[in-house]
Structures are given as structure tokens and as C-alpha cells.
Regions:
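Sec-dependent N-terminal signal peptides
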Residues: 3-13
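Boundary at the C-terminal end of the N-terminal hydrophobic targeting segment
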Residues: 14, 19-20
Length: 192
């Protein structure tokens, strides 16, 4: 399967902004951290491929970003406690494993019940197209490590590790191509 990835500068902007603050450095212009940051990331951000992606994204203007994975099953609630109650990390549902400090082995059991039998890629794409959307992006693998595609490097994926057994990313990519909508994926390198 050949997936065409789109560059979305807004996604990267949050991590690779003009200042490197927090765990990445002081953010002080001219500091050793900033000089290293600029040497590594600025050439990447201005490559011809990235510029073409940036131009394409600006022309498309309107699209859909789907954040979906094992965490979706919990709905922001773990053992009766809402995500907002205690824990560490961002207060958003896709961070439930970290925020509620769920042990990996316990969290991985969610794959046993991940079975979205009503998923229909063509219907999702039809809805996007009918709304005038020009692109669709989905989390192919979030920070929890569970892939929504058939991975050659891990069985912790929708095809090998869940009762659903279908490649969601492949189905969406094919439906987007058929409908003439650009397709992209968000892929987290965390837990690779």
C-alpha cells in the first residue's frame, strides 16, 4: 500500500515553533539549545517537499481530522473517574493512558474489545465530500502505540490485535483516492 502523506504545518508548528521552550530548551535566542534547534529543524521545515505540502494545505483550507483509537472506547472515563479528576498530562481523552496512569498491559487489553463493526470508510468520505472538505487526516498511531493499520513491526494493531481485523488506514486511503480527497495520517513515534 502506498500512502501519500500530506504536510500540515499547523500540526508541526506546535512542536517546532520559533522558540524551543520547556524540555527542549530555554527558548532564548542565540542560546545553545536554540542554535541546535535551528540547525536541525529549520532546514527540514523549509525543504521543497514541505513547501509543496504547505502550499497544498493552504489551497485546500477545509478538511477533517479524525482522532480515533483505543482511547475512544473509554470516553474520558477510567474506573469511574473522569479525565479531569487527578492524574498527570493533558486533559484530553486520547491521553487517558498517561493521565490515569493505566499500566500498559492493562491498557493493551482494550484492543480485545476494539471492534468498530459499523465503520465504513466510504460513508465517512462521502460525509466529508458532501460538506465540501478537501482532505482527511486520521491518527494512524497515537502515543499509546496502537496502530490503525496492518503493521509489520508490531502486532499491537487493528488487524492483528483486535477482533475487527481490518486495516482502517488502508480503507480510508482508498476511499479518499476514489473520491478525489487528499489523505494524510498523524503518526506518533512514541512507543515505537
Amino acid at each position: 500500500m502506498k500512502i501519500r502523506f500530506l504536510f500540515f504545518p499547523l500540526i508541526l508548528a506546535s512542536q517546532f515553533s520559533v522558540t524551543a521552550t520547556g524540555p527542549w530548551g530555554s527558548g532564548v535566542p542565540g542560546s545553545p539549545e536554540m542554535l541546535e534547534f535551528e540547525a536541525k529543524w529549520l532546514p527540514m521545515a523549509s525543504s521543497p517537499a514541505k513547501m509543496r505540502g504547505h502550499e497544498s494545505f493552504n489551497q485546500q483550507k477545509y478538511g477533517m481530522f479524525i482522532h480515533w483509537g483505543l482511547y475512544s472506547q473509554l470516553g474520558g472515563v477510567y474506573k469511574g473517574k473522569k479525565l479531569e479528576e487527578g492524574g498527570t498530562g493533558p486533559r484530553v481523552a486520547e491521553w487517558v493512558m498517561r493521565r490515569k496512569e493505566i499500566p500498559r498491559a492493562e491498557y493493551a487489553k482494550l484492543a480485545d474489545s476494539f471492534n468498530p463493526t459499523r465503520f465504513n470508510a466510504e460513508e465517512w468520505v462521502e460525509v466529508a465530500k458532501a460538506a465540501g472538505m478537501k482532505y482527511m487526516v486520521i491518527t494512524s498511531k497515537h502515543h499509546d502505540g496502537f496502530a490503525l493499520f496492518d503493521s509489520d513491526v508490531s502486532d499491537f494493531n487493528v488487524v492483528d490485535g483486535s477482533p475487527f481485523g481490518r486495516d482502517i488506514i488502508r480503507e480510508l486511503e482508498q476511499a479518499c483516492e476514489k473520491a478525489g480527497i487528499a489523505f494524510g495520517v498523524y503518526y506518533s513515534h512514541s512507543i515505537d
